[in-house]
C-alpha cells in the first residue's frame, strides 16, 4: 500500500511537472538572437479597404494616402495607396527625396516613366509642416532634376525600391498609375495609424490639405 501511494504521488508530480517542463522547452534561450518585436501581432489589410483609398483619391483628387503605420519593434512600416493621373511633362521641382524613410512601390495598374538617382539638382528643403512630411514620409527635399538619373518604364506588377536619400521623379504618366507603397521608417518619425483610424478617415471627405 505504501509503495502504491509513492507511485501515485510520483505520477501526480510527473503530471503537473510536464507542462512546466514543456513550457521551458519552448522558451527562447536568452543566449540566442531575440525577436526584435516582442509579442507583436500581425496586420491584415483587405483588398476592399485598399480599393476604397483608390476610389477616394479619384473622387477627391488626392494623390498619396496613408493606410496604416505599424510598429514592428525597431522600425515602423507605413502602407500607402497612391493614385496619379495623366502627366505629359513633369511639374517644376517635382523630384522627391526622403532623408530617413525608404520606399517600395508595387504597381497595381497603369504605367509611367520614373527617374531614380541620388544626385538631385537644385535641392530645396520641404516645409516641416507639410502633411506628407509629418505623417507619411518624414523630412526630405525636392529638386528640379536628377543628374545621371536612370529612367524606368514601370507598369502593373513591377516593384521599385527607393532607398532613403534617393531622388524619384515621375516624368510621364500615360493615363494613370496606381501603386501600393511600403514605407520603411527605422527612426520612427511618422505617427502610428491603425484600422480604426483608417476606417474613420475613409468615412468622410478628407480635410483640406490632405
What role is predicted for each listed range?
Residues 1-4:
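N-terminal secretory signal peptides that target proteins for export/translocation
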Residues 7-20:
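Bacterial N-terminal signal peptides
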Residues 22-98, 192-200, 204-210:
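A short, N-terminal "cap"/entry segment at the start of jelly-roll beta-barrel domains
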Residues 96, 102-106, 151-152, 159-160:
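His/acidic/aromatic-lined binding-pocket segments of jelly-roll/cupin-type domains
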Residues 99-118, 128-142:
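Short, conserved beta-strand element in jelly-roll/cupin
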Residues 144-149:
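Short alpha-helix capping/helix-loop boundary micro-motifs
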Residues 153-174:
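Conserved metal-binding segment of the jelly-roll/cupin
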Residues 175-191:
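A short hydrophobic beta-strand segment most commonly corresponding to one strand
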Amino acid at each position: 500500500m505504501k509503495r502504491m501511494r509513492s507511485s501515485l504521488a510520483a505520477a501526480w508530480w510527473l503530471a503537473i511537472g510536464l507542462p512546466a517542463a514543456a513550457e521551458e522547452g519552448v522558451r527562447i534561450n536568452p543566449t540566442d538572437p531575440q525577436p526584435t518585436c516582442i509579442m507583436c501581432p500581425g496586420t491584415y489589410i483587405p483588398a476592399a479597404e485598399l480599393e476604397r483609398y483608390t476610389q477616394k483619391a479619384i473622387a477627391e483628387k488626392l494623390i498619396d494616402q496613408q493606410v496604416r503605420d505599424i510598429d514592428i519593434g525597431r522600425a515602423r512600416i507605413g502602407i500607402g495607396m497612391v493614385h496619379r493621373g495623366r502627366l505629359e511633362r513633369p511639374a517644376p521641382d517635382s523630384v522627391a527625396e526622403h532623408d530617413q524613410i525608404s520606399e517600395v512601390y508595387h504597381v497595381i495598374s497603369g504605367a509611367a516613366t520614373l527617374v531614380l538617382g541620388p544626385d538631385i539638382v537644385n535641392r530645396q528643403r520641404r516645409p516641416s509642416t507639410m502633411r506628407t512630411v509629418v505623417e507619411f514620409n518624414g523630412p526630405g527635399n525636392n529638386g528640379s532634376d536628377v543628374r545621371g538619373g536612370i529612367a524606368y518604364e514601370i507598369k502593373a506588377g513591377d516593384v521599385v525600391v527607393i532607398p532613403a536619400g534617393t531622388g524619384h521623379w515621375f516624368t510621364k504618366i500615360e493615363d494613370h498609375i496606381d501603386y501600393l507603397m511600403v514605407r520603411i521608417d527605422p527612426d520612427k518619425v511618422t505617427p502610428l495609424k491603425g484600422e480604426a483610424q483608417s476606417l474613420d478617415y475613409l468615412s468622410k471627405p478628407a480635410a483640406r490639405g490632405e
